[in-house]
Amino acid sequence: MSVMGSGLFFFVVGPSGSGKDTLIEGAKAALGPTGRYVFARRAITRPADAGGEAHEALSVDQFDAVLAQGGFLIHWEAHGLKYGLRATLLDDMAAGRHVIANGSRAMVAALAERVPHLVVVEITAPEAVLAERLKGRGREGAENIAARLERKVPPFPESVTVIQVPNDSTPRAGIEKFVAALVAQTARLRLVRMAIETGRRNVAFLARGNTVVAAPDYLGPGRVDLIGEGRSIRAEVALVGDALLPSDAVGLSSEAFGALGLPEGAELVLTRTPVPESRAALRRKIQGATLDEGAYAQVVGDIVEGRYPDSEVAGFLVAADRSLSDDEVLALAKVRAKFASRITWDEPMVVDKHSMGGIPGSRITMIVVPIVAAHGLAIPKTSSRAITSAAGTADAMETLARVDLDSAEVRRTVERARGCIAWNGRLSHSALDDVMNAITRPLGLDSTRWSVASILSKKLAAGSTHVVIDLPFGARARVKGAGEAHEMARLFEQVGAGLGLTVEAIPTDGSAPIGRGIGPALEVRDVLWVLEDHSEAPPDLKEKALFFASRILAWDPAVGPDRARARAEELLASGAARAALERIVEAQGRWSEPVRPARLTHTVTAQNDGQVSDIDGFAVAGIARLAGAPLDKGAGIDLKARVGDVVRAGDPLFVIHASTAADLEAAAGAALAFDGYGIMMDGKAFRRINPER
């Protein structure tokens, strides 16, 4: 709308109590330093120390003298005082600066004849809010306030551009809206797609000589909002040479352009992202202070809104990694739950099971859920995909059926089958998770206390009432020792109680893989063997699944702790659990053909006689990943020797499965360096386990 050399004149009007002065002062602080806005001082026949707005104090004689010399652009009288705006404001407009002036609605028509590019900004608020503000001033009684609010105002001339800014909330919110309205009229830019990829970061590019905005002013740690056609995106700013972008354009990186979803040439408004109100709280946490729920709500909200650069978020997360009190973990869990999609159930009890993971092959969820569902309790289980392991529960379940369910499909599946095993990426995953994961994973941050808040917030959002948590511990597990596991169990149960959840957290042995298969299809083979009472069913997998299923069934008053184990065994032995898995698979969307273990194989054998004393599950899982798991769901490792088994040189330790010769060769080559097995003979250890572990 505006170009350099032709500024706009913003005439701010509104009833008494609308807060014009506050908004103008706030805008002055935000926009004044740019040098592109002039905030007019009204000349008023009122002493300088009379209070109210900062004005040019003139006597009546002085005012009349300026008027006689043509020094006022416009002038008017109100409440026994004379008001005027200096004619020099026209010079500012001619120089391309935008004028913001506090004015009277009655003078709009006269001003429209004197200035080009007039924009009237009408500040509004409900009568109740106006009355409360006027009462708070203490200048007028109730009768005068009522009379002031009943005054009728003339309509604006049809030829004048009028924008309304509601100021019915906090001063900060009102100032943000006011500034955004001003900038929206002055900073309109054409959208250009830049052939630049910036990864997760949204980047907006401005030519250094941009003629619509002062581009260098937008450099720094702050962000900008780009708004147009009902869509918006938040981005950091980078400058480019004038030859790379038109002077009236804003360029977006490929990722930002796609996220905004508007075509090239669309008109965008550029505004500064408001400074986070929570910055003081964030800095206190970085310095080691304890924050309450309200402070965390502000900090987390501003992080999700993209108001902090990654460096400050990283500082906050490092501080949280070092020190979170029990009360802070509870506060964070409550706050995080608000950023996840909530699911409510018409059920007296909704149960769930979670594992801290890290133990290869421990696919007990696919046995526990069918047992519990066969009993009749609702168990809407959502699980993750593998990040660094050879398979996650979602990867394994996906060999049989769809897992990318939305909340409606989860509800429908549970109604039909009493349970589900779905991927959490479309359900409990939130915008906060995206931000946190992008920063914590490269930095290697893995706070168990932060994890407690995250996990329980998702259970709360999922509508769970009762949750059992598996805490495997061991030298190579995520939780290293029994003491740490028991402390984590205490925290889970305490925070769960604070959220209104019934939580039982149980430390378990995580020193070795569970089951035989490592990789999606091979792990599902083990699951089906257990559910079908196959002679090859891994006993450790069956026992752990029965243990956790019985802990869940014990919550049912009709079963109780004394009968829970027998009930779980009955449901497994009778085939009811196997039938329940079939119902779940059918409800989620069965594949026409399940994924089978890959056909190309390579057997890794023992080099010495002896007894298997140790299996490095992470080393073995690493070989499985080289074979193609988890993306290739048929790839993986089939363990032939378990801890305690006696082997002779040449006996198979495990079999590698792969779908391509190249993957098989890569995995077999890694196994030559270290196969992950420790074998003892006559007290002497023969180890081919990754020495870095």
Swiss-Prot record:
Enzyme Commission numbers on file: 2.7.4.23, 2.4.2.4
GO process annotations (BP): 5-phosphoribose 1-diphosphate biosynthetic process; organic phosphonate metabolic process; organic phosphonate transport; pyrimidine nucleobase metabolic process; pyrimidine nucleoside metabolic process
Catalytic activity: alpha-D-ribose 1,5-bisphosphate + ATP = 5-phospho-alpha-D-ribose 1-diphosphate + ADP; thymidine + phosphate = 2-deoxy-alpha-D-ribose 1-phosphate + thymine
Transmembrane annotation, as ranges: none
Similarity annotation: In the N-terminal section; belongs to the ribose 1,5-bisphosphokinase family. In the C-terminal section; belongs to the thymidine/pyrimidine-nucleoside phosphorylase family. Type 2 subfamily.
Function field: Catalyzes the phosphorylation of ribose 1,5-bisphosphate to 5-phospho-D-ribosyl alpha-1-diphosphate (PRPP).
Name of the protein in its database record: Bifunctional ribose 1,5-bisphosphokinase-thymidine phosphorylase
Species whose genome carries this gene: Azorhizobium caulinodans (strain ATCC 43989 / DSM 5975 / JCM 20966 / LMG 6465 / NBRC 14845 / NCIMB 13405 / ORS 571)
Gene: phnN
